[in-house]
């Protein structure tokens, strides 16, 4: 009886670990998001060549977040990070109307990869503080998210510099990855 209770207790209260891959076009705000979540503050960033990886502790979950550079020359390297990814965060600059089609193409190219077939998708519609930013509904449309019938996805409006929307996104990820486990 005691052993059964111990197993149940540890299953309920043990820290869960989740591997998250965060990608998106260059200058979308990925690194700013990563360090806002990790440190709770805004850090000065430079374009990411390669990757940053940090562990973010939130609600008894340890998120290992891989932030991979988004410049067009290094996007082919994204595929090297796909294996064992449980959640995919795709960050979009909501103010960048000129490149939203490029963002859509990169997203759909990635989602066609077999190694990501089981990963849930969270889209961060970032930079919502800017006056010309597209709202989440417009980005949903422009990214063609409704066509993703076989994929569990969610879009969250965010502002990396204030932190608005970031933890709501982590809540969705934790609930939806946990339900698939």
Swiss-Prot record:
UniProt record, GO biological process: intracellular protein transport; vesicle-mediated transport
In which compartments does the protein localize? Golgi apparatus
This entry's Enzyme Commission designation comes to: 3.6.5.2
> Would I find Lipoprotein among this entry's keywords?
yes
For this chain, the family text in UniProt reads: Belongs to the small GTPase superfamily. Arf family.
Reactions listed under catalytic activity: GTP + H2O = GDP + phosphate + H(+)
In terms of InterPro entries, this protein maps to: Arf1-5-like, P-loop_NTPase, Small_GTP-bd, Small_GTPase_ARF, Small_GTPase_ARF/SAR
Q: What does this protein do?
A: GTP-binding protein involved in protein trafficking; may modulate vesicle budding and uncoating within the Golgi apparatus.
Q: In its keyword annotation, does this UniProt entry include Cell inner membrane?
A: no
Could you tell me which species this protein originates from?
A: Oryza sativa subsp. japonica (Rice)
Q: What is this protein called?
A: ADP-ribosylation factor 1
- Record keywords: ER-Golgi transport, Golgi apparatus, GTP-binding, Hydrolase, Lipoprotein, Myristate, Nucleotide-binding, Protein transport, Transport
Q: Which of this chain's residues are annotated to bind GTP?
A: 24-31, 67-71, 126-129
